[in-house]
A protein has these predicted regions:
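Solvent-exposed loop and edge beta-strand segments that line ligand/cofactor-binding
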Residues: 62-78, 119-137, 179-196, 232-280, ...
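Solvent-exposed beta-strand/loop surfaces of large extracellular or lumenal domains
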Residues: 503-525, 544-553
Length: 694
């Protein structure tokens, strides 16, 4: 028996992971430029640095932060925070942030448990506090991976990085032993089993770096087997019905199931994290069905709770009355969707996944914070007529805020009255942009193929080439691409052309203009081994698109898009922002300006003549998502309504809106990118036409 076990271990240790379709570069190899750099500099000047010291969300009191006197605090908030903070320190020049990073890592490595478990020992009985569980260590492992792989001018020293890799190996071996002993079972804590993909990613990260220990393979198998028996995400995305039977819809006030499976399977953040579960497991299984499950998950999300900004209508949990544009999405769901989409795209090179990543990044992500990144929302919605309570920008707000649209139904409201907002979103929001920077470029074919996936401005350093993308995409219809390389070997340049483009063309400096077909990875023709440089401009042709069939509540409402941008009517509001005093995040509340007309209905938006794109302007220097100065607008025809009961209750009416509610003349209204709004109507009602009103 012992010999058989030993042979099994040897066989496991010699196993290999299935290679990803695209190879991700280490953090620090791709540096933000242009507006993306400006946004990350706002993070460094705002709450991403400040929360290491400020009293906000329990972050600075966490055992994962630098203060040696703090050993408790809000554990999930602290590890969430580090998961975004650490990669940011590799992308933005801030000596103060790097000092905080090093102090935190030193503290973490000095406080391991008796078996080497990060964060200290996990009690081996079944009655333990949430602050001491497997999930409490899964996220910090992702942050430590960023530290260990960080390259470039802001990287730690190699000795410290090696120590972190060693600590991660020991930590995961300790976790494997304890889970195998079921002291406690992996499924005892629901957050861990709902998000086991984080362990898969951590083990695979170590194996990819030569640490092919049998315990890592065993750990992946253990968590997959135990978690999948409780919550089989891939099967659920393939055919699950979240609303049948209705009694299964459990959220915060209704966690009656002892295993919390019903709660976990409806919780929005879990769902967004689980998008990558199948593709991540594919590296172990080699099963094409696993690889394709990310697309299956997105189709499932869009079937049940689609939202216009690429996320879903799920404030905390899937709502019992789904697909309401006034149902918000939790900030954690936004950033976890971005990370899942990036990870899945790297594994299968499906351009639809990167399109979805950009859609979330350019529309939903900016709505999670104020424009100076000094406060965050717990959730936002695509139709939002007040910014207060959990939807406001600030940490530890009291959740006495009900749904934004107070008139739709009482059954779907949920609240945790008089409870300060926990640190999840205040901690987690910081991973959004740094990990998006890392998504812009990959390699394939052992580095011989450079894959430019994103066109937000960046500069990347490869072993034999430097690649940069310039411009202000997505707030422009073009991007410049520059490659400086060491000649001598054959190479390819592969460009992702998004599916939302009507057409695209590549204008090569000193060469021809070639068509680049949308919705594909396009290999640039005519490259030679002796090329030392390459310069080109990628041009996109976009049209205004009116989506008419996406909403049944409100019936007949439309969305208006152009390229990767979703356009909203900016509801006039009165803003109240606290002063930033260096010890706490800002809070921003916005209420409707009752003296300004906002209850509009569009006039025949499907008529091309009724919608006019006004072109792009330069972004505000240093403030990419300046709410006072949107960089683009679409002028639409509309009427101002009066006496519409739905509007009086805070949500848009069904369409068509009867003409008796709008006796005035047709007026021009400006629609702007959702990313540049505080209050907004994105899902818009439509007036009845003359025939309907007859």
């Amino acid at each position: 028996m012992k010999l058989a076990a030993a042979l099994a271990l040897l066989a496991t240790a010699s196993a290999q992971l299935v290679a990803p379709a695209l190879d991700r570069l280490p953090v620090g190899r791709i540096m933000p430029a242009g507006w993306l750099k400006a946004e990350e500099e706002l993070m460094a000047a705002g709450s991403t640095f400040g929360l290491g010291f400020w009293s906000g969300g329990g972050i600075s009191a966490s055992k994962w932060l630098a203060d040696p006197k703090k050993t408790g605090g809000e554990e999930q908030g602290g590890e969430y925070f580090m998961n975004g903070f650490v990669p940011l320190t590799c992308q933005v020049d801030s000596a103060a942030m790097r000092d905080l990073r090093e102090a935190a890592i030193t503290k973490i490595l000095g406080a391991v448990g008796s078996t080497g478990m990060l964060g200290g020992d996990i009690p081996r009985d079944v009655d333990y506090d949430q602050n001491e569980n497997y999930w409490g260590r899964m996220i910090i492992a992702l942050a430590l991976q960023s530290y260990a792989e960080c390259e470039g001018p802001y990287a730690p020293n190699a000795t410290a990085q090696d120590a972190v890799v060693d600590a991660l190996v020991v930590h995961h071996k300790a976790m494997e032993a304890q889970i195998k002993d079921e002291q406690p079972k992996f499924t005892h804590n629901p957050w861990g089993y709902a998000r086991y993909d984080e362990i898969l990613i951590s083990c695979q990260w170590l194996i990819d770096r030569g640490r092919n220990d049998s315990e890592l393979w065993s750990l992946m198998d253990l968590v997959r087997t135990q978690a999948d028996a409780r919550l089989p995400w891939e099967d659920y995305f393939t055919g699950g019905d979240p609303f049948h039977p209705p009694s299964d819809v459990h959220c915060w006030p209704n966690k009656s199931d002892a295993t919390e499976k019903n709660f976990m399977i409806h919780h929005g953040v879990n769902i967004m994290e689980a998008i990558k579960t199948g593709p991540t497991w594919y590296r172990v299984s080699g099963n094409a069905t696993d690889l394709g499950n990310a697309a299956t998950a997105l189709a499932w999300i869009d079937k049940w709770e689609r939202s216009a900004d690429g996320t879903f209508t799920a404030p905390d949990c899937f709502a019992q009355l789904p697909n309401l544009p006034t149902n918000g999405v939790e900030t954690c769901s936004v950033v976890e969707a971005m990370y899942s989409l990036r990870t899945s795209y790297e594994l299968n090179a499906d351009v639809h996944l990167f399109d979805r990543l950009e859609w979330v990044a350019f529309n939903a992500m900016p709505a999670t914070t104020n424009d100076r990144f000094t406060g965050n929302a717990y959730y936002h919605s695509v139709n939002q007529i007040q910014l207060g309570g959990k939807s406001g920008y600030g940490a530890n707000q009291r959740d006495d805020f009900r749904e934004i649209s107070t008139g739709e139904t009482t059954k779907r409201r949920h609240r945790r009255a008089s409870v300060g907002m926990n640190g999840c979103c205040t901690g987690n929001v910081h991973q959004g942009w740094p990990k998006f920077v890392m998504a812009q470029l990959q390699t394939a074919d052992g580095g011989a193929t450079i894959v430019v996936s994103g066109y937000s401005p960046f500069a990347a350093t490869l072993p034999t080439a430097n690649v940069s993308v310039g411009g202000q995409y997505p707030f422009a219809d073009n991007a410049t691409i520059s490659v400086a390389r060491t000649p001598g070997k054959a190479w390819k340049l592969r460009l992702r052309v998004p599916c939302w483009a009507d057409a695209a063309s590549l204008v090569v400096a000193g060469g021809a203009t070639v068509d680049a077909p949308p919705c594909a990875l396009f290999d640039v023709p005519g490259l030679a081994a002796d090329d030392a440089s390459f310069e080109a401009t990628l041009l996109f042709t976009h049209s205004i698109k009116v989506l008419e069939d996406k909403w049944t509540n409100p019936k007949g409402a439309v969305e208006i898009t152009r390229g990767p941008l979703l356009f909203s009517f900016p509801v006039p509001g009165r803003r109240n922002t606290t002063s930033l005093n260096g010890t706490y995040v800002e809070t921003t509340f916005v209420m409707v300006d009752a003296g300004a007309p906002w209850q509009i209905a569009l006039v025949d938006p499907t008529d091309a003549a009724s919608l006019t794109f006004g072109g792009f302007e330069a972004l505000t220097a240093g403030l990419p998502f300046d709410r006072d100065r949107p960089p683009a607008k679409i002028t639409a025809k509309a009427k101002v309504t009066t006496g519409v009961k739905s509007y009086d209750k805070g949500y848009v009416p069904d369409s068509p809106v009867q003409s008796k509610y709008a006796n005035g003349s047709v007026v021009d209204v400006d629609l702007v990118p959702l990313a540049h709004t505080y209050l907004r109507l994105t899902v818009l009602p439509v007036m009845e036409n003359a025939t309907e009103g007859a």
